[in-house]
Design a protein with these regions (language model features):
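Conserved small/polar residues in nucleotide/adenosyl-binding loops
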Residues: 187-193
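Conserved ABC ATPase "signature" region
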Residues: 97, 101-104, 109-127
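Catalytic Walker B motif of ABC-type/P-loop ATPase nucleotide-binding domains
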Residues: 156-159
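Helical segment within the ABC ATPase nucleotide-binding domain
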Residues: 171-183
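Conserved ABC ATPase signature
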Residues: 131-135
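Conserved catalytic motifs of ABC-family nucleotide-binding domains
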Residues: 152
Length: 193
């Protein structure tokens, strides 16, 4: 995975420094970034997933320069935000199929196979006909992971991975991350994660 961050700064228009001279080398594998609310974790995450521009500094993800190669980075990146949203009109299968189409899977047979395999991997195959917004909290989280992984990204970034999950679902979710992704960056304010 290798993420390299050099002299990264983010200063908001009001003058607040969200990030100041951040230098970090994130190796391949699981990596957690732990810190209290307001420490800049979410700002750093938004920059890494190309949702926010840094004020200055350099970021490389798998050899791609974030400022010059955003399209390439989006192609290798899976992202699961803390407050993942589902389209109420889609069933679980349809939602994941839509994500697969957006990721560039154009052949119906290839897409169906990828969606079926991913639903099986995350334990949602039996509820594929249920509307996504009617799933339990843990099931929604797993569907979010499936959506982030459907295009087989090299890197997955997860914000507050177990927020809102009961203890049993937390364990299942952590195990799922270990099973389906070799390269995972977790942002959390919960040391248990």
């Amino acid at each position: 995975m290798s993420i390299t961050i050099k002299n990264l700064n983010k200063i908001y228009p009001n003058g607040n420094h969200a990030l100041k001279d951040v230098n970090l080398e994130i190796p391949t594998g699981m990596f957690g970034l732990l810190g209290p609310n307001g420490a800049g974790k979410s700002t750093l995450m938004r920059i890494l997933v190309a949702l926010m521009e840094p004020t200055s500094g350099q970021v490389e993800i798998c050899g791609y320069d974030l400022m010059k190669q955003r399209k390439e980075i989006r192609g290798i990146l899976g992202y699961l935000p803390q407050d993942f949203r589902f389209f109420a009109k889609y069933k679980t299968y349809e939602f994941l199929d839509y994500a697969a189409r957006l990721s560039g899977m154009t052949q119906n047979r290839q897409r169906k196979q990828a969606v079926d395999e991913m639903l099986e991997n995350v334990g949602l195959f039996d509820v594929r006909e249920r509307y996504a917004n009617k799933l339990s909290g843990g099931m929604k989280r797993r569907l979010g992971i499936a959506q982030a992984l459907i295009h087989h990204p090299k890197v997955i970034i997860v914000d507050e991975p177990t927020t809102g999950l009961d203890p049993e679902e937390r364990i299942r979710f952590r195990n799922l991350l270990y099973e389906v992704s070799e390269n995972c960056l977790l942002y959390t304010s919960d040391a248990a994660d």
